Amino acid sequence: MGKEVDVSTLEAGGVRDRDYADPPPAPLIDIDELGKWSLYRAVIAEFVATLLFLYITVATVIGYKHQTDASASGPDAACSGVGILGIAWAFGGMIFILVYCTAGISGGHINPAVTFGLFLARKVSLVRALLYMAAQSLGAICGVALVKGFQSGFYARYGGGANEVSAGYSTGTGLAAEIIGTFVLVYTVFSATDPKRNARDSHVPVLAPLPIGFAVFMVHLATIPITGTGINPARSLGAAVVYNNSKAWSDQWIFWVGPFIGAAIAALYHQIVLRASARGYGSFRSNA
């Protein structure tokens, strides 16, 4: 049975009687933002959130490696520690907590790839995106530096939480893992923050941070054995800067190119395929 969409309704700006409204696209360059305290408050929130994220997660990784080190913890060390599951929970849980805390201030990006995807979708201006990325990168460096400062011996011994392509995996495999993992994350961000979903679920404020944190958890389970899981260029940069190892630096490009490609694909998929305006395509017919 055929079903027609009313073209006049579409041309008027969307379906009538909607209980939500799409926000207008952010300007590409908004110089006026530089004079607003709300921008700098958001930048500070991104810095602090990324610092806390890196401190907790890298400390968890270092602690796990120490607990499973037979030379330090005895012959049964392999059976102790939080395991990969615990590491994945640390990353996913911290993202859930920090997105919940900062969503109303900065949007809770905590990741340059997320910021890049939202910029491509015109959710944030170029000025805000660049300041967020700088704050996230600096926060990540400071967070890892705190771990090194408090656990200097363990930090150097157990790799500093740096991302590298693991032995047995090719560069292409590592890059693909980062692209797909970041796509999952950024796609989840777009879906969880969709205006239509927010209008329906606004009475349950945890429903946006929860799937985002869970996406981070699931991606870590899949990609920790391959790359240690980047999907966040700031996280990878912070560990590389403080650890300062040649292998971490030689693989660093993977943890920027991969996440940015994954974020771009997710943004295009959400904006062009899932949220495409009917105005751009004329009338539609469904023969379902």
UniProtKB/Swiss-Prot annotation:
It comes from the Eukaryota. Pfam families: MIP. It is a multi-pass membrane protein. A motif (NPA 2) lies at residues 232-234. The keyword tRNA-binding does not apply. Coiled coil: none annotated. The keyword ATP-binding does not apply. A motif (NPA 1) lies at residues 111-113. InterPro entries: Aquaporin-like (IPR023271), Aquaporin_transptr (IPR034294), MIP (IPR000425), MIP_CS (IPR022357). The chain crosses the membrane at residues 42-62, 81-101, 130-150, 172-192, 206-226, 254-274. GO terms for molecular function: water channel activity. It is found in: Cell membrane. Its main location: membrane. GO terms for cellular component: membrane; plasma membrane. Aquaporins contain two tandem repeats each containing three membrane-spanning domains and a pore-forming loop with the signature motif Asn-Pro-Ala (NPA). NCBIfam families: MIP. Aquaporins facilitate the transport of water and small neutral solutes across cell membranes. Belongs to the MIP/aquaporin (TC 1.A.8) family. PIP (TC 1.A.8.11) subfamily. This is Aquaporin PIP2-6.
